[in-house]
Every structure is written in structure tokens, then in C-alpha cells.
């Protein structure tokens, strides 16, 4: 029997992966002619990330830092250069689009701010994975043997997404007012294998293996 725990902090804000796992494995010689075995594992995980943080998405902070010049500000600042705060207590991020919070405009990914997406938007996956493998080895008679393998895998995943209604392309001023989404997925699979073999040596010379 074994158990494990992983808490992997992400390198970007509000991201990370947490996992709990356990495994039980046993073999038992039931009779001289029958051996049985089992291997069962359970995993629960929680993942925090941005739904559109990959590839050339505006929420990909690494992509944005490569294509957007360092002259563009991350935050909206006042005349003294201080980062401004809105009436909700949020830092005001620069979206680089007139009519939105910005110190100016930019052609590169306008109406978006990857850091703001990480701080204000939420995406979480929670999953439970159960995997079981069972086997039986049967010595039937005089070189004839049977083997049975059965495997069951169950995977339950629940995803929750929240895109803030305050800033960005889904803000109230854009006519959307934020997004909320919840989805669930369950997969179940069974794998069965039944084998019958024959192995016999005659006169210490000839061998038959089927």
C-alpha cells in the first residue's frame, strides 16, 4: 500500500496543481492451482489555470510578453505614476484600448491584459480517477493453464470557469457582463482478457507451447 501528495505551485498567478493519490496491491495464492491478484488506485486532483492560456491566446502571458513591446504599461497610473485602484479595490490594469481602462492605445492585443486575466478570471478542474486491475491464474491440468485479466477505469472531471464582468472583452461595458460556465465529464472503460495456454515437454526433448 502506498499514498502520495503533490502540491505544485504554478509559475504564474492563481495557477497550480494539487493531487492526492493512494494505491493498494495484493497477490494471494488461494489454492496450489489458483493465484489471484489485485491492484487498485485512487487519485483526486485540483488544477487552477486559465482556460485560454495556451498558444497565441491573449491570456497566454508568455506569448504576450514576446509580441508586445516593453513600453506598454501593465497598469493604469495617475499623474504621479502610482498604480490606480478602482472602487472595488482592484488594481486597474491597462487594456490598451480607448474607452477602456488605459493610459493610451496599442495595436498589439488591444482590449486584453494577460495579467488581469490571471488575477480576475478563474478556471478550475477537479477530478477523481479510479483504476482497478484484477487477475487470476488457474493451473487446470497437466500443462493447461488459464489466465483472466480484468481492468476498470473511471474518470470524473468537473470544470468551473468564471470570466470577470468588470474588464476586458467580456466586461459590462462590452455588453456581455462576464461569463460563468460549469461542465462535467465522466468516462468509464472495462478491459477484459481471457487466455488459455498449453505448455508441455515430452521426454525432456520436445516442447509444445500453445
Predicted stretch roles:
Residues 17-23:
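Transmembrane beta-barrel architecture of outer membranes
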Residues 6-8:
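Ligand-site clamp/hinge motif
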Residues 144:
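An active-site-proximal structural segment forming one wall of the substrate-binding cleft
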Residues 11-12, 25-131, 147-210:
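Surface-exposed loop/interface segments of Gram-negative outer-membrane beta-barrel transport/assembly proteins
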Amino acid at each position: 500500500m502506498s499514498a502520495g501528495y503533490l502540491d505544485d505551485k504554478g509559475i504564474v498567478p492563481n495557477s497550480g496543481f494539487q493531487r492526492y493519490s493512494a494505491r493498494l496491491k495484493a497477490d494471494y495464492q488461494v489454492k496450489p492451482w489458483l493465484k489471484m491478484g489485485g491492484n487498485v488506485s485512487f487519485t483526486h486532483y485540483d488544477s487552477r489555470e486559465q482556460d485560454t492560456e495556451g498558444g497565441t491566446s491573449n491570456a497566454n502571458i508568455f506569448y504576450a510578453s514576446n509580441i508586445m513591446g516593453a513600453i506598454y504599461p501593465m497598469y493604469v497610473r495617475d499623474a504621479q505614476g502610482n498604480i490606480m485602484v478602482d472602487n472595488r479595490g482592484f488594481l486597474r490594469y491597462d487594456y490598451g484600448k480607448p474607452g477602456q481602462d488605459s493610459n493610451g492605445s496599442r495595436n498589439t492585443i488591444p482590449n486584453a491584459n494577460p495579467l488581469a486575466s490571471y488575477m480576475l478570471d478563474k478556471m478550475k478542474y477537479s477530478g477523481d480517477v479510479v483504476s482497478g486491475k484484477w487477475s487470476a491464474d488457474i493451473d487446470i491440468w497437466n500443462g493447461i493453464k488459464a489466465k483472466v485479466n480484468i481492468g476498470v477505469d473511471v474518470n470524473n472531471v468537473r470544470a468551473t470557469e468564471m470570466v470577470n464582468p468588470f474588464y476586458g472583452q467580456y466586461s459590462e461595458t462590452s455588453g456581455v457582463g462576464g461569463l460563468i460556465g460549469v461542465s462535467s465529464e465522466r468516462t468509464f472503460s472495462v478491459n477484459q482478457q481471457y487466455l488459455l495456454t498449453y505448455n508441455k515437454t515430452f521426454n525432456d526433448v520436445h516442447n509444445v507451447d500453445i
